[in-house]
């Protein structure tokens, strides 16, 4: 394993990296950083959670001239959440060197962003639409940019941003370095690379490694009407510390979050219709453990970098292998083991096999748990709580009362009563969920078309106006 010390980084960057607690590089960092420092174009096939932000962030910070007040690097990201998280990490990497980093994205007051742009940031991290808005207004100038990063390019393709990316790149100097990161490499992404990159070096994560070996992957074949009861039984048995439940639609996310709360779970939903303030509030509560279950759509969860997620539940099967890779990549991080469970209706088995073929990874079939098994799971949790109190708490104040109880009742009956009080019995409160139609097996789309369900609905196709 390569250490950052071996990469010949500046003292300023090394000090920042040490503050962040980094010592050894990840594979994507070990391969990408030296190439980037040599000003070579790089295509990195890597998903979120592999350390790719530092892989492009460290070279960017190294190459920024802080005495030059112009924008020198541009990172394009598909979502607001990813733009914020990337900018936060770049800020940490550049803190000692005093590199100014600014995120710009839709949903935030544009006048506030204009004021921030006047403070001369060195690095811009933004979503395609908002970057174009600022270029059109003349508030963002890119003529001094020497590095462009396209982060999660496949997701920008799925969201219909390819034309926007092409327009942005046409306003960046031809003499630049371009770094492109993508979990998958569909043809439109390859064409972007051919058109806008100069003899790029490919740093590739093999397909068999794409879904991360330390994630246990299971599927459950279950009818639509029974999915919610099965989900709550799994939650009772597995008792995840932090879990993400994925739904296919915004309506599904809202209904699932409400239904989970109705049954006594601390859950909140996140999707594109929420205000930015609400989304950030939900994410903060999830990171702090105030809620134990985050219910999310694919788009809302893109790029989320939340440590400690132990379980991912695909309540609705993902529409394509790329989404599956992104979803389960929320867990199994930093060397820890994660668990991914995918619910499949009988008519969606073909889609499951399509995902398995593409990721080159078989999911293990799991039998849907029964109500009795859910109760046993909660009993195990109650026993663990009881034993923890026995081992760690001072019980002397309670022992006299315990002795009096034992004079009147046998010990087994008393312990059973304690367990009953501590056990959260499975809740069968009726809930109402709108049924989602089964997902058909994804077919290869015709050249030039868009992936199923990914037509540009959020933004119209926009061109940059000349100045």
From Swiss-Prot:
ATP binds at residues 46-53. Residues 214-374 form the Helicase C-terminal domain. DEAD-box RNA helicase possibly involved in RNA degradation. Unwinds dsRNA in both 5'- and 3'-directions, has RNA-dependent ATPase activity. It holds the Pfam family Helicase_C. The keyword DNA-binding does not apply. This is DEAD-box ATP-dependent RNA helicase CshA. Oligomerizes, may be a member of the RNA degradosome. GO terms for cellular component: bacterial nucleoid; cytosol; ribosome. Belongs to the DEAD box helicase family. CshA subfamily. It catalyses: ATP + H2O = ADP + phosphate + H(+). Its EC number is 3.6.4.13. GO terms for biological process: response to cold; RNA catabolic process. GO terms for molecular function: ATP binding; ATP hydrolysis activity; RNA binding; RNA helicase activity; RNA strand annealing activity. Residues 33-203 form the Helicase ATP-binding domain. A motif (Q motif) lies at residues 2-30. Keywords: ATP-binding, Cytoplasm, Helicase, Hydrolase, Nucleotide-binding, RNA-binding, Stress response. PANTHER family: DEAD-BOX ATP-DEPENDENT RNA HELICASE 47, MITOCHONDRIAL, DEAD-BOX ATP-DEPENDENT RNA HELICASE CSHA.
């Amino acid at each position: 394993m390569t250490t950052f010390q071996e990469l010949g980084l500046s003292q300023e960057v090394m000090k920042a990296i040490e503050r962040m607690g980094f010592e050894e590089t990840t594979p994507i960092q070990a391969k990408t950083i030296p190439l980037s420092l040599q000003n070579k174009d790089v295509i990195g096939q890597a998903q979120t959670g592999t350390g790719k932000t530092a892989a492009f962030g460290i070279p960017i910070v190294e190459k920024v001239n802080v005495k030059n007040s112009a924008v020198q690097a541009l990172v394009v990201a598909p979502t607001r959440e990813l733009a914020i998280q990337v900018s936060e990490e770049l800020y940490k990497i550049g803190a000692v060197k005093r590199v100014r980093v600014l995120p710009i994205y839709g949903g935030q007051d544009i006048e506030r962003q204009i004021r921030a742009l006047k403070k001369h940031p060195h690095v811009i991290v933004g979503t395609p639409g908002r970057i174009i808005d600022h270029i059109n207004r003349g508030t963002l100038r890119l003529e001094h940019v020497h590095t462009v990063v396209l982060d999660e390019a496949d997701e920008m393709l799925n969201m219909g941003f390819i034309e926007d990316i092409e327009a942005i790149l046409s306003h960046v100097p031809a003499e630049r370095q371009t770094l492109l990161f993508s979990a998958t490499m569909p043809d439109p992404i390859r064409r972007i690379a051919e058109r806008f990159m100069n003899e790029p070096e490919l740093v590739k994560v093999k397909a068999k490694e794409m879904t991360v070996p330390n994630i246990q992957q299971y599927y459950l074949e279950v009818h639509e009407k029974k999915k919610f009861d099965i989900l709550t039984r799994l939650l009772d048995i597995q008792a995840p510390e932090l879990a993400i439940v994925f739904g296919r639609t915004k309506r599904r996310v809202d209904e699932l979050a409400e239904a989970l709360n109705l049954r006594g779970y601390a859950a909140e939903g996140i999707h594109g219709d929420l205000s930015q303030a609400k989304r950030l509030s939900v994410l903060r509560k999830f990171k702090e453990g105030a809620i134990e279950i985050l219910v999310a759509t694919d788009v809302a969860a893109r790029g989320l970098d939340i440590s400690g997620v132990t379980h991912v539940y695909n309540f609705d099967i993902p529409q394509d292998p790329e989404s599956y890779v992104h979803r389960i990549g929320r867990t199994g991080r930093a060397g820890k083991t994660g668990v991914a469970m995918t619910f499949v209706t009988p008519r969606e088995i073909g889609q499951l096999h399509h995902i398995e073929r593409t990721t080159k990874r078989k999911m293990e079939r799991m039998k849907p748990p029964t109500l009795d098994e859910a109760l046993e799971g909660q009993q195990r949790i109650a026993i663990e709580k009881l034993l923890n109190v026995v081992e760690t708490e001072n019980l002397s104040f309670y022992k006299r009362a315990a002795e009096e109880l034992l004079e009147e009742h046998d010990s087994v009956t008393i312990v059973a009563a304690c367990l009953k009080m501590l056990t959260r019995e499975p809740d069968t409160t009726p809930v109402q969920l709108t049924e989602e139609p089964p997902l058909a097996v994804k077919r290869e789309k015709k050249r030039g078309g868009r992936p199923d369900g990914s037509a540009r609905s959020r933004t119209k196709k926009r061109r940059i106006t000349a100045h």
